[in-house]
Structures are given as structure tokens and as C-alpha cells.
Design a protein with these regions (language model features):
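Helix-turn-helix
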Residues: 11, 19-53, 57
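N-terminal intrinsically disordered/low-complexity leader segments
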Residues: 1-7, 74, 209
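Generic hydrophobic, amphipathic alpha-helix propensity
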Residues: 8-17, 33, 58-66, 132
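Hydrophobic alpha-helical connector segments
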Residues: 72-102, 151-158, 209
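C-terminal peripheral helix-coil segments that are non-catalytic and often amphipathic
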Residues: 95, 99, 129-142, 157-209
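All-alpha amphipathic helical-bundle segments outside canonical DNA-binding/catalytic cores
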Residues: 84, 120-124, 141-157
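Conserved hydrophobic residue
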Residues: 25-26, 116, 145
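Short secondary-structure transition hinges
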Residues: 53, 95-131, 153, 180-187
């Protein structure tokens, strides 16, 4: 079951996320978070226990919000052609991973010992797999997809290259042109999206007309 956050906790988490996105987890202090949130430093301990536990709750909160937004997003494209739906779902997932890239190192470590984080993420993966399966079946029925790979394999094909790109900047930056960190992230995201779209549609046997 998803954790319910109070309004005060949500306020603190939103402030923390804004700061961590700019300065990183290590570069953001509890004092900075409490100052910007206009609360006493002790309130961080009261609501979350520690900075590390607050980060775990922040990730849990972000996954919950992303899951809600994904459901809303897929509703807006439900009447589109299957190939367009698949393209937009892929782009959405990749964009979300890049947007919240500052979580990934933390999440890999924290998930080894935090069961509720695993559960939140598994629920989101299951929703993604169900949507991908639905789109694939519609594409087969419409005759635009030739093959029907397992939906979990398609999700793996989306997540794998994206996470590799995010975690291996020193390697990827050899192959993209950029002059700022922001430009690098844009170009890296564009590169991996193009690769994943090509790979998934090849797996589906889809050929653009």
C-alpha cells in the first residue's frame, strides 16, 4: 500500500527535491532544506528520522506522483494509433528517468535494504508493463505490429540503455556534442531515445509508412 504523506511532509519533500536537483544529495544540507522550507532543523528528524531516510521518502513520493501522472498521460493518448502510443510511452519513461536522474545512485543502494521502495517501484513497473502489453496487442490487431514480444522485455529494453546512459557519462560524452551540462543531458537523452525507439519498433516488426 502506498504511504500517505501529510501536507507538511509534502512541503518539505518538494523543497528538498528542488535543492537536491540543483546541488545533489551530498551538496544539500539539512540546514538548507529546513531554512528554505521555513521549519526548524529538528522537524526533519521528527518527520523523517534523518537526511538519508528523507531521501528514501522523497523517492517513494516521486514514484507515487509519477505513477499518477503516467496514468493521466496514457489516458490522453488512448485514442491514438498504436505506434504513436508506443512512441509516446517510450519517450515519457525515458524523459522521467532523465528528469529525476539524481535519484539513481541513491536508489540502487537504498533498495537493497528498503522493502517499501521496492514495492513502489514494482507497482510502477507493473503499470508500465500492462500499458505496453495493451498497446502491443492493439498494434497486432491493427496490423501495424508484426511481432508481439513480452511487454516486460520491452520495458527492460527501455530502462536498460537509459540507466546505462545516465550512470556512465564519462563514456557517453565521447559520442555527443555539448558545451554545458544541460546540453549534455539533452543530447544524451535524445541519443538514447532514438536508439530505444529504433530497437523497440524493430522488435515489434513495425515499419513506418
Amino acid at each position: 500500500m502506498s504511504k500517505k504523506f501529510t501536507d507538511k511532509q509534502i512541503h518539505i519533500l518538494n523543497v528538498a527535491e528542488e535543492l537536491i536537483a540543483k546541488k545533489g544529495f551530498e551538496g544539500t544540507s539539512v540546514r538548507e532544506i529546513s531554512s528554505k522550507a521555513e521549519i526548524n532543523v529538528a522537524m526533519i528528524s521528527y518527520y523523517f528520522g534523518s537526511k538519508e531516510k528523507m531521501m528514501a521518502y522523497l523517492y517513494q513520493f516521486r514514484v507515487q506522483k509519477t505513477r499518477e501522472h503516467f496514468a493521466e498521460f496514457t489516458e490522453t493518448i488512448k485514442d491514438a494509433k498504436p505506434q504513436m502510443q508506443m512512441r509516446e510511452v517510450i519517450k515519457y519513461i525515458v524523459s522521467q528517468l532523465f528528469k529525476y536522474n539524481y535519484f539513481h545512485g541513491f536508489v540502487t543502494q537504498e533498495m537493497r535494504q528498503t522493502e517499501h521502495l521496492k514495492n513502489e517501484l514494482m507497482e510502477f513497473y507493473e503499470i508500465c508493463v500492462a500499458k505496453i502489453d495493451d498497446i502491443t496487442k492493439k498494434g497486432i490487431a491493427a496490423g501495424v505490429f508484426t511481432f508481439a514480444p513480452q511487454p516486460e522485455d520491452i520495458l527492460t529494453l527501455i530502462l536498460g540503455p537509459t540507466l546505462f546512459t545516465i550512470r556512465n557519462r564519462k563514456f557517453i560524452e565521447i559520442f555527443v556534442v555539448y558545451n554545458t551540462d544541460e546540453k549534455y543531458m539533452q543530447e544524451a537523452e535524445k541519443k538514447v531515445k532514438a536508439y530505444i525507439l529504433m530497437s523497440v519498433f524493430a522488435l515489434l516488426g513495425y515499419v513506418a509508412q
